Amino acid sequence: MVKSQEAGGGREVFRVAEDLRARIAGGAYPLGSFLPPQRELATEFDVARDTVQKALEVLKGEGWIESRQGSGTRVVKVMQVQSDTAKDAKEGQVTLREFFDEAFDAPEIVLDVYTLTSESLNTQVKTQVDRIRDRKVAPRKVALRMLLPAQSLDSPYPRALAGPDEPQRDRPDDELTVRLKERLHDIERHNSASIRQSLLQLQAEGLLESAHIEIRYVKIPPVLKLYLINGTQAVHGPYTITERPIVLPDTETIRALDVVPMDSKLMHYVKDADPRSRSSVFVDTWQEWFDSVWDHLAR
């Protein structure tokens, strides 16, 4: 197999995994439901069945699905947010999709986001773009500031793990670790570009009056993801460190130490009339933190 074909195969694995992940997050495949058979997915995406299998391995490694021979592939996780407000506490956990649905019901949306790759955000933005195109919501303005880790950052993850008969892989210049980080940067570039293009396209078509997107990079390895909306709400949760298989662009699968953004347990806080309440202090504190990093450290 030539190099270009191998790279293309990796891109197809990424494309299929991204699409299926978005469907799960968007509710097309609810918790406990089964994905279509692999043969059907291969036909739909116009790829080889082996590509579908590798994409499913990616989702399995992220904790979205589980597969059992003869039983199909079942969804075992959806992105949920536990609210700290009295109203939502009665309703229990809500999905991140429901949270963004409510946010985009407003005429103006101001989003400040601190994240590793913006993969989750891209999924939610695509869903809201569809709602806007379907005339289900009609916001006028969207302003997004996003903080991402600088590519020059020597982050402790992702990192290739040694096999049973291999020496320890603890050097930052280890070949597989370098390739893992290149893959991470590719994912970040893809998702941030997709977010920018999606929102600016809505503005170009007149479906948004204004779309302002600004992205800066900071030399801080994310240990949590943070969404701040309109200065009044905060959603945050820690990243989970885990060992999992990762498919590289040349389709090689390696064992690695990584974080699983989609596995975060997100908490939701809403400012109220009491500036000293736990929720109000939480939102204000994290907004101040974001602004300080944006102004003094990010480039």
PLM feature spans:
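Short helix-terminating capping/connector loops at secondary-structure junctions
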Residues: 31, 137-142, 205-212
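Short, cationic-aromatic polyanion-contact patches
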Residues: 12-13, 37, 71-88
